[in-house]
């Protein structure tokens, strides 16, 4: 697999990498582990943030099962746009498909999406259809609320835990009580 580190203004890009042999036993980590010493080779990567960094930011994309050549090709044209990389939200858009993925670490907004809670969302708008999925990744909230700066003609489908507040503009809630991080989906006709 590979890693891609976007070169974006304001991001830390000084990556250091090393390969090391490390030795130790499970017993050294806990009183219950095995005692034989095991030696393994590990790769390690880190960004040097310096001492006491303020708002240090970096971004990377995991590319599982990609060869070195495929990773190099991807780095020339990733097709990914970083929409937000702030304390309140991290969001990306896959340019060709138009899919947006976002993690809100509290109330925040990106593009046309306003989340009033911590949440994870993934959505796609195509041919007048907005397909929107949301989850409570921290699994401790009972209700997620979303406000979109778009109007909908109708709801095509929705999970039963979603309540429509308004279609113009779009506003809805997601009941995540005991959902254990499950995603809930709604589709709008725009």
Model-based region annotation:
Residues 1-96, 100-104:
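C-terminal (or distal) subdomains of carbohydrate-active enzymes
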Residues 63-190:
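Non-catalytic terminal regions with compositionally biased, polar/charged low complexity
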């Amino acid at each position: 697999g590979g890693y891609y580190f976007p070169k974006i203004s304001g991001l830390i890009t000084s990556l250091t990498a090393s390969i090391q042999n490390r030795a130790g036993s499970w017993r050294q980590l806990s009183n219950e582990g095995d005692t034989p010493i095991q030696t393994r080779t590990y790769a390690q990567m880190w960004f040097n943030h310096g001492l006491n960094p303020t708002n240090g930011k970096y971004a990377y994309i995991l590319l599982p099962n990609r060869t070195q050549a495929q990773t190099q090709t991807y780095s020339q044209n990733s097709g990914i746009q970083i929409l937000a990389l702030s304390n309140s939200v991290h969001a990306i858009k896959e340019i060709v498909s138009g899919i947006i993925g976002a993690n809100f670490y509290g109330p925040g907004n990106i593009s046309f999406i306003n989340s009033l809670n911590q949440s994870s969302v993934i959505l796609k708008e195509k041919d007048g259809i907005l397909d929107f999925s949301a989850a409570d990744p921290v699994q401790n909230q009972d209700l997620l609320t979303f406000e979109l700066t778009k109007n909908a003609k109708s709801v095509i489908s929705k999970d039963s835990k979603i309540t429509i507040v308004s279609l113009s503009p779009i506003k809805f809630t997601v009941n995540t009580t005991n959902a254990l991080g499950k995603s809930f989906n709604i589709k709008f006709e725009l």
